[in-house]
Amino acid sequence: MRRRTLLGAALAGAAVTPAFAFGTARAADPGPSVRRTGTTTLDSQAVFFVSYDGLVNNNSFQKNGLLTYKGYQYAAWYTADRNAVVARRVLGGTWSTVQVGHTLKADDSHNVISMGVSKVDGRLHLTMDSHSDGFTYVKSVAGLMDNPAGLSWTPARFGAPQSTLDGLALTTQFTYPQFVSTPEGRLQLSYRVAISGNGRNALAEYDGSQWTALGEWSSSTGTYTSEHGSSTARNMYLHGIDYDGNGRLHSFFTWREQNGAVMCNGGGITNHDTGYVYSDDRGRTWRNNAGTVVGTTGGSDKVAVTDTGLVVDALNPDHSLMNQESQATDSAGRPHAIISYVPGRFGQCTTNYVSDRTANGRAFHLRKNASGNWQKTEIPVPLNSSQRTKLVLDRYDNAYAIFPFGRIAAASAASGYTDWKILFDGSGLNAFGEVVIDESRVEADNVLSFMYQEKSSGTTPSALHVVDFALPA
């Protein structure tokens, strides 16, 4: 695979889309805007501890920690006494909360709760509390999500916690559960097998009667060589996994190498390159940007670092590139992502990824344009954090970047995403860091809704909230 030089990759990361670029929006389409419409409190005393520079209730890679379905919104978190709970409300109403029979086992921010809806039978599914070990799974009775007004919200609506998916064991080293609904209404579960730096991505699928393991689709093997050294093991970190309106499954990713010898300094992080793959057969086979098959789920040929045509934005491991950031697709089915790292103008070697990202990290909007080319625009907002930024597109394809601390920047499709500016500076939230976006609510009722937890110290519990912003009508 061709790779850019150290200097070239870093400078390319700081490149800005020319001002004459244009989007697909009509001139009459409104630009981006947000209007804060309300804040609700889920829990005045949610569990709080800082782990991996994040919180277990607010890791932006949760899919989903907050979701909307058929006029109701659902949220999941851990309380101060470590109980896993799930709440619901009719949109605009008050929250009702139930415990699901599980307590958080470790002070590890990876051990998030993720929710998904199987539209085929109206169940709510939850996986939780795992970091390269066993997971806990809970599902509701059938029809609960289809008739929320007619079915009471009680613990009896949920089955007992399980260590398998209804008997399907998957793996003893399970991390990063992400649920996604297929166009037919089946529910898929994306997860990592094994460990950071030596793991594989896999899929399972629920058809309304049973779970099936579709298998692994990314490879941990092969040799990657940087300017500094080589690595023979890695894992693929997904920026997301999402179906567009035409049924194509998209995934941006970055690689994390096992061997720190690929870095200029051991205080950095071995993430490198932004890659992209897609699937037109519900995740069974994967294609690179050119349309060439590069992997088969459950087969011997998996997506590997040595495959050509995967990298859509090259960057070596010396710039503290973040993993598991964010992605979305626009109304034409074109993929967009947010990636972030320390641009080359701040130096060619990060030595402490937390402090360097906090001091000099920047987020970039990466997208495929109408011509099929990849464009990248630096968002002129300092991260002021080591953490992740989330991406949302409104009905007019305007882009919104939700930064740590709940700050919102946006750019118009009409400008070709060159007019980024802050719309909300996070004032009054007192948010700790990353926020959890309700991706489904943007489509459901044109509201940007996100969950955030207030700052605290030590292990002192703090309040967990949901804030709502109206987007352009």
Specify the residue positions occupied by each region the protein language model found:
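Extracellular, repeat-based ectodomains that mediate carbohydrate processing or recognition
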Residues: 30-473
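N-terminal export signals
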Residues: 5-24
